[in-house]
Amino acid sequence: EKYPQAIHAMAHITGGGFYENIPRVMPITTSCIVRKRDIPSNPVIDFMVNRFVMTEKELFTTFNMGIGYILMVDKNSHHSIFETIQELLKNQNGISVHTIGYISQHQGNPTVELI
């Protein structure tokens, strides 16, 4: 209600992880660039990464790297949306908000790119 034009897409990161769920909500000719360094450390995920031999794509598909939901928002409204969500989640243990990437233009179908 507060940001009617600023939230462009939302994706619940379930089975299929980043590579299947994010492209479903993106327009053609866009790419979701995920900055791995901005994904918060998670002890359970760290344990899985160290315990199992998996490719990066398998980790992001199977374990979602601890990310459960993604919002794609207008870059000019990002800061105020971020603060609003932080305020809404302040009493929710274990739930937090992070900026982990951005959308860019590219040729072809929607993609997810890890950097």
Go through each PLM region and give its residues.
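Glycine-/charge-enriched secondary-structure boundary and capping motifs
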Residues: 1-115
